[in-house]
Amino acid sequence: MTDQGVAKEQYITVGSLKEIADPVKKFLRKGNRKGRNQKELKFRAKVVNQQLADETGSINFTTEGVAVNNNQTYEFTGSLKVVDYKLNLAVTSATPAKDQIANLGSEQLSKADIDQHSGKHIVLIKDLINLRIGQSFFARPKDIVHNNEQRRMTATLADNTAAIQAEISVNKKSITQEVLESLNSDKVYLFSDVVLNFNESNKLVARFNYRSNIVEANDRQIQQLSNNNLSAKEYSDETEKKALTDVLQIHEKKERVHKQQNKNKNPRNAHKNHNRQRPNLQETEPVKISGLQQWNNNQTVIGKIVSLRTEDKSLPAKQDGTSTTMVYLKGTIGDETGVIDFDMAEKRDCPRFKENDVVKFTSVMNKGRQSAEGKVGGHYIEVKKFGQYIILSDHNINNVNLNNNLSNLELTARPKNPNPRFIKGEFVGVKEEEKDGNIQYTYTVRSKEGEEQSITIRNKITTLKVGEIHKIDRERKRSSSRPNHQGGQRGNRSHSQNNRNQRNRDKHHNSQNNQPNKYKNTSVQNNNNNKNQQRSQSQNQRPPRNYDNRQGGENRNNRQRNENNRNNFNGNGHRVNNQNNQRNRNSSYPRNNNYDHHHNQQTDISGLEPGKRGQNVTGQVIEVSEFSKQINDKTLHFVKGRIADENANIRFDIKKPQNLEIKVGEVYNFKDVNNKVDDNGYHYIDLNRFGRVFPSHKKFQSINDKRNCDADRSSIEYVKKTVPN
């Protein structure tokens, strides 16, 4: 080009290749498939000692029939590759540049080893991080033990820094039985995509999954193997093991919860789970035993287990004859103020406590037992469905007041709701009365304990029988009828009523008395009676599936005809689809709307969960900078910096918003962010596809702008916080 300034803008620097490392890793992992080839990069660099260098850094390169001279500057085109475990530029063309590059940068991009299989850096065994997924390292196997029946083997992988026990199984891709049998203790191998996890002996071992790979490294030598076995430590402390396991399971666990929450938020599933959603009960402050409130189902108490016994109870048998046995924990818990009995079902996700343990109960309800006369007896507590019991190993209660036993005191009757939504029990009778010119009915039922409950509604229910068990709901017109799924609750006419009106109208307009068509008749006469008959048939029964491919076209025609005939007429003569459109018109989502993250929850910076999408966070910008990237011949602008609130601060790296300038000292709301972890194990947030940034009116009295010695890292340290040394 003639304009030198324009020509320079088309080329990227060598140092900026580090910025596009992640796309290169993804490319290497997926392989050089059709349609996934990298586009060629354009850059200016100087040939210096078998490397290409400019003002930002240097990188190794290879040429394919391209001749270059040392200490000369060229305009190159090429792509990134991995050659001999080093990041390399494959040059396809070189044109001498008009001006030379004088000052060269010191950063070397080809210094670290890169695994071509996973696209990640190769580390030493001593630098392996506990429970991190997808790590690669060079090692020599020793103490190899094969198990041909289970198609797996165990070995100790070692280099000159450390060793670790490994459990290798055959996968469907790269690790075959022949590969396992060919492993030799005298050779060095590259083990790719390895995860550290616990074995049956509570020790950390290296495990291989379906992505893992084992390749012989002929150009690598490990002379002396280290005896520092990382698997020698046994994690006997359940608390320490659980803290490590949470790091590995947090992504898939949060993903399951996130999918279930999105399923519950879908209006189409509202009738399935409107009674199954977990209540948003926040843990309350612990209270003393003597301060337990009666009939309050959201209390927290801490006490010492005085006595404990278990009791098995079989649930009613199912239709297939199987029955489930529940384990109930019963005993006494106390503190300095008194003691009280407890009676609750054992929870599978909570470890069982024993006598003299200090335990915290959450979502506790102070209840009372029913006597034979129907009166409420003494106190006892129960952990509700969504509560937990947690063993507090660092808490101690020395003196327990055994003289004040709350279970011996009489508990007042549970307060009744003066206006319940529904009542259930043995029907006693109904009373009719007039109020404000309207007739209303008061229905009375008797519970199993002999208590009578009443409910007053305006609807008269004629299906109730004295002495039978009924549930009377205020919101339903009938007590024991199923919902009308054909539009009755929405005020629409049912299909049978529509069909009856259509038949009467068709008889009036057409005097011909044709025989009704058979089901799936391909010849349909052009008259209203036949159309109406086929409408009725298609609505009341569905055509059976036909798996004969030779008649697929005919069956498709019949199904399409039945779909078209489901369009009924309303009272005004207009054609509408009562079966789908009217019922779901206001309950479906737009096609391009990301309804997975409609209900994002606001959280503090310290409460951001790693790997979880759809989080909202508000913070004050304490530093900001802009930079540009050349991606696919396009220049994209990005903004990175750091935001902080009262508790913590974190880095952000996002695409520059349109019509918004992010300034230091201003407060912004980051909506729908993803808390990611970089290769060094530290947090940063970026925006998801539908995320955005906008100013916030929130004010902070003080912010936490403290950071580590390395200002490039966030204050939330993923590795140091979750994994002990």
From Swiss-Prot:
Q: Which cysteine pairs make disulfide bonds?
A: none
Look up keyword Lipoprotein and say if it applies.
Answer: no
What does the entry report about post-translational modification of this chain? The N-terminus is blocked.
One Gene Ontology CC term in the entry = nucleus
What spans are recorded as compositionally biased (Basic and acidic residues)? 468-478, 545-564
Q: Main location per UniProt?
A: nucleus
State the organism named in the record. Answer: Tetrahymena thermophila
- Top-level taxon of origin: Eukaryota
Q: Does the keyword Lipid metabolism apply?
A: no
Gene Ontology MF terms: DNA binding
Q: Where is this motif: Nuclear localization signal?
A: 241-258
What InterPro entries does the annotation carry?
A: NA-bd_OB-fold
State the function annotated in the UniProt record: Binds specifically to parallel G4-DNA, a four-stranded structure stabilized by tetrads of hydrogen-bonded guanines.
Segments carrying the region annotation (Disordered) are 252-284, 468-614
Which compartment or compartments is the protein found in?
Answer: Nucleus
UniProt keywords, alphabetically: DNA-binding, Nucleus
In its UniProt entry, what is this protein called?
G-quartet DNA-binding protein TGP1
